[in-house]
């Protein structure tokens, strides 16, 4: 329990905004959701990462039971861009991913991984989403420049020992992000998003603060309202400007985003493969006999013609 609380506090500090780390995806999904994939198919990380970006996943077409294989996850982005960090400065993007495997599929244990696979995995640390969801793996945040492509070491189940698993085609779901989110789990905005005018009116004052800027708007219907803007977004308005309600008064500094992908994998029955090999062997033998029989028949015809 103490270890879990420590992990939560560590990743919470990453979210709130140290200068060197990005939004602590996907740890916040762990804290707030029993399952990261909603009934609609939407992965909950999209609640905080509002921009849509592509992701890609590559797995074998089929695997045998109780075998180690790899899933290659790609989270592409322009590695020349910088994002707004929690303190308002600019820095590199981090990436994170959640891989939702079929029930029974898990992360491969180290003693089952080949030296080549270990080299591909590198220093990435994967962990199950929860104790009862060993088939859902999460990783990150990690530096995007080094890990925009990740290799997940996976282990397929064996229906002979796990009666809940069958030889079928199964879906695999991926969620991947690059960069910090725009909304915190409590619904409040981060400093990595656009800020809008709280009411229609005129910009009366722009006051620098310790954490950013306060923009005071004299409302059309009287009174005033203050929009607190944290360090990060750039102001688009000046004192004296007229603004409409919900009009953007800052740029959108977000350069990252979240994406979902899916693929399929077949848990192949070895007996079926053996049967297929035997069948193909019989077909090959039959073809050979047909060729030999045809040649024999041609020889007989030729000899009769010569006679």
From Swiss-Prot:
Cofactor: heme
InterPro entries for this protein: Cyt-f_TM, Cyt_f, Cyt_f_lg_dom, Cyt_f_lg_dom_sf, Rudment_hybrid_motif
GO terms, molecular function: electron transfer activity; heme binding; iron ion binding
Keywords: Chloroplast, Electron transport, Heme, Iron, Membrane, Metal-binding, Photosynthesis, Plastid, Signal, Thylakoid, Transmembrane, Transmembrane helix, Transport
Binding site for heme: 25, 45, 48-49
Compartment list: Plastid, Chloroplast thylakoid membrane
Taxonomic superkingdom: Eukaryota
Gene Ontology biological process terms, A to Z: photosynthesis
Position of the signal peptide: 1-24
Pfam families per the UniProt record, alphabetical: Apocytochr_F_C (PF01333), Apocytochr_F_N (PF16639)
Transmembrane segments: 273-293
Cofactor binding comment, as recorded: Binds 1 heme group covalently.
Role, per record: Component of the cytochrome b6-f complex, which mediates electron transfer between photosystem II (PSII) and photosystem I (PSI), cyclic electron flow around PSI, and state transitions.
Family from the record: Belongs to the cytochrome f family.
The protein's assembly and partners: The 4 large subunits of the cytochrome b6-f complex are cytochrome b6, subunit IV (17 kDa polypeptide, petD), cytochrome f and the Rieske protein, while the 4 small subunits are PetG, PetL, PetM and PetN. The complex functions as a dimer.
Protein name: Cytochrome f
Native organism: Ostreococcus tauri
Phylogenetic lineage: Eukaryota, Viridiplantae, Chlorophyta, Mamiellophyceae, Mamiellales
Gene that produces this protein: petA
């Amino acid at each position: 329990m103490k270890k879990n609380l420590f992990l939560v506090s560590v990743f919470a500090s990453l979210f709130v905004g140290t200068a060197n780390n990005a939004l602590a995806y996907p740890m916040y999904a762990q804290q707030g959701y029993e399952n990261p994939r909603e009934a609609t198919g939407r992965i909950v990380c999209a609640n905080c990462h509002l921009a849509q970006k592509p992701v890609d996943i590559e797995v074998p077409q089929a695997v045998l039971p109780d075998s180690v294989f790899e899933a290659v996850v790609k989270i592409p982005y322009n590695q020349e861009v910088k994002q707004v960090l929690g303190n308002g400065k600019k820095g590199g993007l981090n990436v994170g991913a959640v891989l939702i495997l079929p029930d029974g599929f898990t992360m491969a244990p180290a003693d089952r991984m080949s030296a080549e696979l270990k080299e591909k995995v590198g220093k990435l640390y994967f962990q199950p989403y929860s104790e009862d969801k060993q088939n859902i793996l999460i990783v990150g945040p990690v530096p995007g420049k080094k890990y925009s492509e990740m290799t997940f070491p996976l282990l397929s189940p064996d229906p002979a020992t796990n009666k809940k698993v069958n030889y079928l085609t199964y879906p695999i779901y991926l969620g991947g992000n690059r960069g910090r989110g725009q909304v915190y789990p409590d619904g409040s905005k981060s400093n990595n998003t656009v800020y809008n005018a709280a009411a229609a009116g005129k910009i009366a004052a722009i006051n620098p603060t310790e954490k950013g800027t306060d923009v005071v708007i004299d409302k059309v219907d009287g009174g005033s309202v203050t929009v607190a803007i944290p360090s990060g977004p750039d102001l688009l308005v000046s004192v004296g400007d007229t603004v409409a309600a919900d009009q953007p008064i800052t740029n959108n500094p977000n350069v990252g985003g979240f994406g979902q992908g899916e693929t399929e994998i077949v848990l192949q029955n070895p007996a079926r493969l053996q049967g297929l090999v035997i069948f193909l062997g019989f077909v090959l033998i039959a073809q050979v006999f047909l060729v030999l029989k045809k040649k024999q028949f041609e020889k007989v015809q030729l000899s009769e013609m010569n006679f």
